[in-house]
């Protein structure tokens, strides 16, 4: 395992990349409504990223089990947990949820963030899943401080979600991030306090709870990218990129624009 500690200047570059990702999610948020296809959202995201001088990291991302990822964002609707491929057949409907995972490479460093959106009016049960998953993200971030361990992050996420009856995905994790989209260490959403890699100043990690309404079992689709819940129940996914900076967690990505639009 090789963990790359970032300098103050490198963290600033990562902040810029992650702010662009946050702005891209904000741009996508303007178009989340019934009747829109996931391919339309992908085109909006790719244009915005490229117009701002960056490269969509996910596009052509390699897959050891199949074809490279063909799009600029992952669009995971309802029971799709992660890696949904945008297409012109998936049309958003009132009551859907859609997780949009976005990555961008700007000036040599990566940004990565995900937000689960409501399409129109969703049920109170689904809203609670989203709220709990977002809360778990921030509880995990609170534990991303120098001197704690990776297990402290996962334990905080797991305890919050499982105490409310939700499934915590094991097979998919957060990760280190920097010049590469996926670096060491892995950041699971479960664990034991005080276990795992020691957190140090300069580490940059993506924390991303992936939480299911029902059983946590996952099923891989034939495209070798799309991963769904096996029981067909919905899943939520929220992600921030965080720097352990001056001893504490600093969130480099942003939901500010998305949440502003949600309030209006």
Please give the residue ranges for each predicted region.
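Active-site neighborhoods and metal-handling regions in enzymes and metal-associated proteins
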Residues: 1-264
